[in-house]
C-alpha cells in the first residue's frame, strides 16, 4: 500500500475502550460487539470471551487489558476498522485502565440502568477525560425490572457533567442497542491522528512472554509503519531487535504484512530478555529513529507491600523467574530479594492494593505451580529518627529501635464511598472505627449519598472492603486515592516464641489498639501453634516491654504410670528428672510456625475492635 492508501485506511480506524464499574456489563457488551461484527463465529463464542485467564472467569472480573481488531460495515456502506481495548473495572487495576485509555481516541461509558453511577465509574471517567477521549454514555441492562434509565440519564448529566441526551439505551445480555452503539462509534469517535510518513513511534501498552518467540510487544502505532524485517530500537535503553512478525488479535493472534499509524497489534522481535522491554516505552526504527519518545505512562507506586516466600526453599529461582514474567505484563508489580530468619529466602513485593496482591499470589500458584507463604501486608511508613533522618520503611522488621524514633508518619487515602442513604450510619461507624476523619458528604439523588473520608491506608489494607460490603449488604462502592502523610502514634509490635523474635510476625499498630491487638494475636497463636514437648511462652512486645503473654502447655508423658504405690521420693525423683529434661529441651528446642499463624496476624484486626 502506498502512503495515500494508508492515509485513507487511517481515516476508517476507530480505537475505543469500554469503561465501567465492576458488574455493569462491560465484558458482556464486548461479547455482543464481537458477535455483531462477526469477529468470532457463534461456535467459538463463549461468555466473557476476552477474559482469557481462568482466574478472570472464576471471579467474573477483568484483570488484564485486551486489544482486538474488528471490521464493521456501517450504514453508510463503508467498512471501518475498530480496535476494542477491554479494560478492568476494579480500583486495584486503575493502572491497567490508564494504559488502555492511552491507546484510544474514544471510550464507551457503560452505566447500569438499575444501580446508576458508582465510585469506580467516576474514577475511570476522570481518567478518560485526562486523556481527552470522546466519551459515549451507554445505559445498560434496561431489561431489568429495577431499571430506571431516565434517572440514570440525569445522574450522568448531574454527577459527571456529560450530555446524556443521546445516550444509547441498551441491554448487552439481550443484544438490544448494539447497532446504535457501533454507529455512534463511527460518527463520534475521531480517527487516529498521526503521520504514516513520519519516523516510527509505537507505544508499548502491554507485553507477554512466549517460550518460543521471546517477549511479544502489544503496541499502538502513533506515527509511521512497522513491517517484518525492520530493525527496531527501544527508546529508553537504545537496544535494537529484528522484527520477525507483526499482527493483530481477533482475539487469536493473526499475522499481518505491516502495522501502520493508528493500528493496535503485536510485534515479535526475538526479544529474549524480559528486562529489555518496559510497558510505556516507545519503539522506533533503528535506521530512522524518532526525535523524542512518546509521552509514556506515569510510574505507579505500590501502595501495599508483603513478603512472598516459596514453601520449598529450592524453588527460590523459579519464583524469581515467575515474578519477572508476571512483571512483563503487569508493570505495577515491584519486587526485590529479602531474607527472613523464620522463612528463609524470598522477595519483598509491592502491589497496588489487596486484590492485586491476591491475584498475583493466585497466578504464581496456578500458572507457575509454586506453593507460597505470604506475610501480612504493610504500607510505606516515613520514620523520622532522632538524628533528623527520614527513612521509608515498608517491612516492620526493618523498623529502627524505639529509642531512635522521633516520630512516624503514615499514608492517608481519600476514600470516596457511594452508598444508599439507609447505610450512611454504618459506613460512618466503620470509617471512624478505622481511624478515619470525616471530610464531606453530598447527595447524588434522593437515595444515594457520596461520603468522603480521610482514612489511614494501613486500615484499608486489612479488610476494609469486606467489612464495607457486609455492613451495607453489598450496596456500597468504594474508590480511593493517595492523599498525604500524617504523623501518627504508631508502634512496632514484636511476637516472641520461646523468647525468640519471629521477624515475619512483627507488625505496626496504632498505640491505642496495641494492647488489645497484642492480646488477641497471642491467644490466636496459642490455638494455632501445635503443642511441643516443652512449655512455649508466646509474648507480644513493644520494644522491651511485654504487653501480652500466653503459654502453650507442654505435652508430657506420665512418668509415674509404672509406680504402683511406693515411696513418694521415688516419684519425686522421676518428676524432677522429667522436669530437667524439659528444661534442657526448651533451651535448645525450636518451634515450628505453621502458615496459618502468619495469616492470623491479618485476620485478627477486626476481632480487636468488636
Swiss-Prot record:
<dbReference type="InterPro" id="IPR004161">
    <property type="entry name" value="EFTu-like_2"/>
</dbReference>
<dbReference type="Pfam" id="PF00009">
    <property type="entry name" value="GTP_EFTU"/>
</dbReference>
<dbReference type="GO" id="GO:0003924">
    <property type="term" value="F:GTPase activity"/>
</dbReference>
<dbReference type="InterPro" id="IPR038363">
    <property type="entry name" value="LepA_C_sf"/>
</dbReference>
<dbReference type="Pfam" id="PF06421">
    <property type="entry name" value="LepA_C"/>
</dbReference>
<dbReference type="GO" id="GO:0005525">
    <property type="term" value="F:GTP binding"/>
</dbReference>
<comment type="similarity">
    <text>Belongs to the TRAFAC class translation factor GTPase superfamily. Classic translation factor GTPase family. LepA subfamily.</text>
</comment>
<dbReference type="InterPro" id="IPR035654">
    <property type="entry name" value="LepA_IV"/>
</dbReference>
<dbReference type="InterPro" id="IPR000640">
    <property type="entry name" value="EFG_V-like"/>
</dbReference>
<keyword id="KW-0472">Membrane</keyword>
<dbReference type="InterPro" id="IPR000795">
    <property type="entry name" value="T_Tr_GTP-bd_dom"/>
</dbReference>
<dbReference type="GO" id="GO:0005886">
    <property type="term" value="C:plasma membrane"/>
</dbReference>
<dbReference type="GO" id="GO:0003746">
    <property type="term" value="F:translation elongation factor activity"/>
</dbReference>
<keyword id="KW-0547">Nucleotide-binding</keyword>
<dbReference type="InterPro" id="IPR005225">
    <property type="entry name" value="Small_GTP-bd"/>
</dbReference>
<dbReference type="InterPro" id="IPR041095">
    <property type="entry name" value="EFG_II"/>
</dbReference>
<protein>
    <recommendedName>
        <fullName>Elongation factor 4</fullName>
        <ecNumber>3.6.5.n1</ecNumber>
    </recommendedName>
</protein>
<feature type="binding site">
    <location>
        <begin position="23"/>
        <end position="28"/>
    </location>
    <ligand>
        <name>GTP</name>
    </ligand>
</feature>
<dbReference type="InterPro" id="IPR035647">
    <property type="entry name" value="EFG_III/V"/>
</dbReference>
<dbReference type="Pfam" id="PF03144">
    <property type="entry name" value="GTP_EFTU_D2"/>
</dbReference>
<keyword id="KW-0648">Protein biosynthesis</keyword>
<dbReference type="InterPro" id="IPR027417">
    <property type="entry name" value="P-loop_NTPase"/>
</dbReference>
<keyword id="KW-0342">GTP-binding</keyword>
<comment type="function">
    <text>Required for accurate and efficient protein synthesis under certain stress conditions. May act as a fidelity factor of the translation reaction, by catalyzing a one-codon backward translocation of tRNAs on improperly translocated ribosomes. Back-translocation proceeds from a post-translocation (POST) complex to a pre-translocation (PRE) complex, thus giving elongation factor G a second chance to translocate the tRNAs correctly. Binds to ribosomes in a GTP-dependent manner.</text>
</comment>
<dbReference type="InterPro" id="IPR013842">
    <property type="entry name" value="LepA_CTD"/>
</dbReference>
<dbReference type="Pfam" id="PF14492">
    <property type="entry name" value="EFG_III"/>
</dbReference>
<feature type="domain" description="tr-type G">
    <location>
        <begin position="11"/>
        <end position="193"/>
    </location>
</feature>
<keyword id="KW-0378">Hydrolase</keyword>
<dbReference type="Pfam" id="PF00679">
    <property type="entry name" value="EFG_C"/>
</dbReference>
<dbReference type="GO" id="GO:0043022">
    <property type="term" value="F:ribosome binding"/>
</dbReference>
<dbReference type="GO" id="GO:0045727">
    <property type="term" value="P:positive regulation of translation"/>
</dbReference>
<dbReference type="InterPro" id="IPR009000">
    <property type="entry name" value="Transl_B-barrel_sf"/>
</dbReference>
<dbReference type="InterPro" id="IPR006297">
    <property type="entry name" value="EF-4"/>
</dbReference>
<keyword id="KW-1003">Cell membrane</keyword>
<feature type="binding site">
    <location>
        <begin position="140"/>
        <end position="143"/>
    </location>
    <ligand>
        <name>GTP</name>
    </ligand>
</feature>
<dbReference type="InterPro" id="IPR031157">
    <property type="entry name" value="G_TR_CS"/>
</dbReference>
Amino acid at each position: 500500500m502506498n502512503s495515500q492508501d494508508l492515509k485513507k485506511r487511517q481515516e476508517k480506524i476507530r480505537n475505543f475502550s469500554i469503561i465501567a464499574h465492576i458488574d455493569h456489563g462491560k465484558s458482556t457488551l464486548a461479547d455482543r460487539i464481537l458477535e455483531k461484527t462477526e469477529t468470532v463465529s457463534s461456535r467459538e463464542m463463549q461468555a466473557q470471551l476476552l477474559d482469557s485467564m481462568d482466574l478472570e472467569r472464576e471471579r467474573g472480573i477483568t484483570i488484564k487489558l485486551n486489544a482486538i481488531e474488528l471490521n464493521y460495515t456501517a450504514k453508510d456502506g463503508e467498512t471501518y476498522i475498530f480496535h476494542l481495548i477491554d479494560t478492568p473495572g476494579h480500583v486495584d487495576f486503575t493502572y491497567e485502565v490508564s494504559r488502555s485509555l492511552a491507546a484510544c481516541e474514544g471510550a464507551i461509558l457503560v452505566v447500569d440502568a438499575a444501580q446508576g453511577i458508582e465510585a469506580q465509574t467516576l474514577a475511570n471517567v476522570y481518567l478518560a477525560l485526562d486523556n481527552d477521549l470522546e466519551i459515549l454514555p451507554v445505559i445498560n441492562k434496561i431489561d431489568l425490572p429495577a431499571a430506571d434509565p431516565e434517572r440514570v440519564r440525569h445522574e450522568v448529566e448531574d454527577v459527571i457533567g456529560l450530555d446524556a441526551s443521546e445516550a444509547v439505551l441498551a441491554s448487552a445480555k439481550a443484544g438490544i442497542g448494539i447497532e446504535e452503539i457501533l454507529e455512534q462509534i463511527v460518527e463520534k469517535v475521531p480517527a487516529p491522528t498521526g503521520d504514516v510518513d513520519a519516523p516510527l513511534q509505537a507505544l508499548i501498552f502491554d507485553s507477554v512472554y512466549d517460550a518460543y518467540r521471546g517477549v511479544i510487544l502489544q503496541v499502538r502505532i502513533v506515527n509511521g509503519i512497522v513491517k517484518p524485517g525492520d530493525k527496531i530500537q527501544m527508546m529508553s535503553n537504545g537496544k535494537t531487535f529484528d522484527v520477525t512478525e507483526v499482527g493483530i488479535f481477533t482475539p487469536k493472534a493473526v499475522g499481518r504484512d505491516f502495522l501502520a499509524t493508528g493500528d493496535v497489534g503485536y510485534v515479535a522481535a526475538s526479544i529474549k530478555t524480559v528486562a529489555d522491554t518496559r510497558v510505556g516505552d516507545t519503539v522506533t526504527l533503528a535506521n530512522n529513529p524518532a526525535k523524542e519518545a512518546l509521552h509514556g505512562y506515569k510510574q505507579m507506586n505500590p501502595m501495599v507491600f508483603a513478603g512472598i516466600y516459596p514453601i520449598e526453599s529450592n524453588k527460590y529461582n523459579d519464583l524469581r523467574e515467575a515474578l519477572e514474567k508476571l512483571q512483563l505484563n503487569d508493570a505495577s508489580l515491584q519486587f526485590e530479594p529479602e531474607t527472613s530468619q523464620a522463612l528463609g529466602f524470598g522477595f519483598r513485593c509491592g502491589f497496588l492494593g489487596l486484590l492485586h496482591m491476591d491475584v498475583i499470589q493466585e497466578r504464581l500458584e496456578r500458572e507457575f505451580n509454586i506453593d507460597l507463604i505470604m506475610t501480612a501486608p504493610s504500607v510505606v511508613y516515613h520514620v523520622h529518627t532522632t538524628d533528623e533522618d527520614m527513612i521509608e520503611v515498608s517491612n516492620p522488621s526493618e523498623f529502627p529501635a524505639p529509642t531512635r524514633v522521633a516520630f512516624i508518619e503514615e499514608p492517608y487515602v481519600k476514600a470516596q464511598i457511594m452508598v444508599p442513604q439507609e447505610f450512611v450510619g454504618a459506613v460512618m461507624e466503620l470509617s471512624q472505627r478505622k481511624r478515619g476523619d470525616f471530610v464531606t458528604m453530598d447527595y447524588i439523588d434522593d437515595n444515594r449519598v457520596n461520603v468522603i473520608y480521610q482514612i489511614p491506608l494501613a486500615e484499608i489494607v486489612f479488610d476494609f472492603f469486606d467489612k464495607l460490603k457486609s455492613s451495607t449488604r453489598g450496596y456500597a462502592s468504594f474508590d480511593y486515592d493517595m492523599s498525604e502523610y500524617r504523623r501518627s502514634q504508631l508502634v512496632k509490635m514484636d511476637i516472641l516464641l520461646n523468647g525468640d523474635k519471629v521477624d515475619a510476625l512483627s507488625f505496626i499498630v496504632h498505640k491505642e489498639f496495641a494492647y488489645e491487638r497484642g492480646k488477641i494475636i497471642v491467644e490466636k497463636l496459642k490455638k494455632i501453634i501445635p503443642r511441643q514437648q516443652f512449655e512455649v511462652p508466646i509474648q507480644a512486645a513493644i520494644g522491651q516491654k511485654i504487653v501480652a503473654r500466653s503459654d502453650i502447655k507442654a505435652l508430657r508423658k506420665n512418668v509415674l504410670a509404672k509406680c504402683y504405690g511406693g515411696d513418694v521420693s521415688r516419684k519425686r525423683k522421676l518428676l524432677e528428672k522429667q522436669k530437667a529434661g524439659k528444661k534442657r529441651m526448651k533451651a535448645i528446642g525450636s518451634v515450628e510456625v505453621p502458615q496459618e499463624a502468619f495469616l492470623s496476624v491479618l485476620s485478627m484486626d477486626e476481632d480487636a475492635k468488636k
